[in-house]
Design a protein with these regions (language model features):
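N-terminal glycine-rich anion-binding loop in soluble enzyme alpha/beta folds
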Residues: 1-60
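Short, well-ordered coil/turn segments that N-cap beta-strands
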Residues: 12-16, 63-66, 96-98, 134-137, ...
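Conserved, mostly hydrophobic/aromatic
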Residues: 18, 68, 103, 139, ...
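Active-site-proximal loop/turn and secondary-structure-junction residues that shape catalytic pockets
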Residues: 22-24, 72-76, 106-108, 143-145, ...
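Acidic (Asp/Glu)-rich catalytic clusters
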Residues: 58-65, 92-95, 154-159, 227, ...
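N-terminal active-site wall of soluble small-molecule enzyme domains
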Residues: 64-66, 70-132, 222
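Conserved anion-binding
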Residues: 108-212
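A C-terminal functional module that forms or caps the active site or interfaces directly
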Residues: 217-256
Length: 256
């Protein structure tokens, strides 16, 4: 899947991902009104508004961009109807040949981690049959629990030709409370970056690994260091725009 992402970035000349993080207050009134007229002011009505809003964004961008990134919490808050909207969004984006990055930030161990990986990237066994569920192409994951939390995802990625973006240095202001803590004279995020690079070396596409990293745009100097630490890992860079990241600040995150 990393090869497809690289190819689509080159084809579109757009190293960007469109976040599909719908908030009801941002959805145009005519979309919300139509959904509420049909389903009422219900969870189903909210989910329909979200789905139609996402569909409009995808229809107007799919030939300009390589990927979309739906944030699952924005859907989960509306319960099962919200997750239906998430599922419809993922499937529609894939119909349009977009790469889908599920921004799910899962982090657990053992069978629980394996279940998360199966639900988002793999296939679940039901009797003699297997079923794909949300079926995103990539997922974001939290490495705080170590290899026990990451390996089940890597196993599914290898089997299903999928990929990961592992949180290394996040864009939020308080990320330094833990991520910048020094261990043997080096910040924790560098140690995490080294581990991502090691995992990545063992799981390569043509030129880059399908084990990528999340490094916030709000910390370009740290991004510069981490680019060198993880030369073969694609970096997902949140925080551009509203959070303060700038175009000039993004340069260190690129190899070329």
């Amino acid at each position: 899947m990393i090869n497809k992402l690289v190819d689509k970035i080159k084809k579109t000349n757009a190293p960007v991902v469109v976040g599909l993080d719908p908030m009801m207050s941002y959805i145009p009134e005519h979309i919300t009104k139509k959904a509420f007229d049909e389903f009422g002011e219900t969870l189903e009505g909210a989910a329909e508004a979200i789905w139609q809003y996402n569909k409009g964004i995808i229809d107007n961008t799919y030939d300009l961009i390589p990927a979309v990134k739906p944030q699952i919490a924005m859907y989960e808050q509306f319960g099962v109807p919200g997750l239906v909207a998430f599922d419809k969004t993922v499937k529609y984006a894939k119909e349009k040949d977009l790469v889908v990055i599920g921004d799910v930030k899962r982090g657990d161990i053992g069978s629980t981690s394996a279940a998360y990986a199966t639900g988002h990237l793999g296939k679940v066994q039901v009797g003699s049959k297997k079923y794909s569920l949300f079926d995103e192409d990539f997922a974001t994951v939290n490495p705080y629990l170590g290899t026990d939390g990451i390996k089940p995802f890597i196993d599914v990625c290898k089997e299903e030709n999928k990929g990961l973006f592992i949180l290394v240095k996040t864009s939020n202001p308080s990320s330094g409370e833990f991520q910048d803590r020094l261990i043997d004279g080096r910040p924790l995020y560098e140690w995490v970056g080294e581990k991502v690079a090691k995992w990545g070396e063992e799981h390569m596409g043509n030129d880059y690994s399908y084990i990528g990293a999340v490094v916030g745009a709000t910390y370009p100097e740290m991004g510069k260091v981490l680019r060198k630490v993880m030369p073969k890992s694609y970096i997902l860079v949140p925080g551009y725009g509203a959070q303060g990241g700038t175009a000039d600040g993004l340069k260190p995150y690129f190899n070329e």
